[in-house]
Amino acid sequence: MSQLTLTLLMIVAAYLAGSVSSAVLVCRMRGLPDPRLQGSGNPGATNVLRIGGASSAAMVLFFDMLKGALPTYLAYLMGIDAISLGLIAIAACLGHIYPIFFGFKGGKGVATAFGAMAPIGDDLAICLMASWVVLVLISRYSSLAAIITALLAPLYTWWLDDRFTIPVAMLSTLIIIRHKENIQRLLKGEESKVSRKKRPKAP
């Protein structure tokens, strides 16, 4: 099988894997409202945190990251070049953003993109996670944390393993474009902050 054929097959496989909406499936399994219809309307871990609590959000985060990590890492093991790895990672993110199995209404692609970056190395994964967590704790804005972490990701990659700077920059660009509306709301002071589902008070 030629390298081009293998790359195209992995792009299709990555898109299909990305199209499995973890947020919708976890909410269905746990008897929670459809995240596309509740909260921010975004089927991602942050919105599931709002409507279903931390454990449900953690499950969504794990599976969303896995959707990006698995096809990208498999392609790396197959010897596919760095630029093609970036295209495969973008395909997984586009599956998450425009899922064929869920009416093409998906999330922002942040967890899937960061999952695709994580196999580059533990050090990069730690830098990305630490940046996002610190920024969320400081600002309370998940979107702002994602945007700034996406901007930092190519710099981290260039510093740690410059072979993958271009594909990571491709993913970062996609994340920022996907957050265009969030950027506008942040500038207007209208963006929602991160909050957990409130537990009912005991009688």
Swiss-Prot record:
Main location as per UniProt: membrane
Pathway(s) of this molecule: Lipid metabolism; phospholipid metabolism
UniProt GO MF annotations: acyl-phosphate glycerol-3-phosphate acyltransferase activity
Regions annotated as coiled coil: none
Subcellular location: Cell inner membrane
SMART domains hit by this protein: G3P_acyltransf
Biological processes annotated in GO: phospholipid biosynthetic process
Enzyme Commission number: 2.3.1.275
Bilayer disposition of the protein: Multi-pass membrane protein
GO cellular component: plasma membrane
Transmembrane segments: 6-26, 82-102, 118-138, 141-161
Class of this enzyme: transferase
Keyword tags: Cell inner membrane, Cell membrane, Lipid biosynthesis, Lipid metabolism, Membrane, Phospholipid biosynthesis, Phospholipid metabolism, Transferase, Transmembrane, Transmembrane helix
InterPro entries per record: G3P_acylTferase_PlsY
Annotated Pfam families: G3P_acyltransf
HAMAP family for this protein: PlsY
Function: Catalyzes the transfer of an acyl group from acyl-phosphate (acyl-PO(4)) to glycerol-3-phosphate (G3P) to form lysophosphatidic acid (LPA). This enzyme utilizes acyl-phosphate as fatty acyl donor, but not acyl-CoA or acyl-ACP.
Record-stated family: Belongs to the PlsY family.
Subunit note: Probably interacts with PlsX.
Protein name (record): Glycerol-3-phosphate acyltransferase
Organism per entry: Shewanella sp. (strain ANA-3)
Gene of this entry: plsY
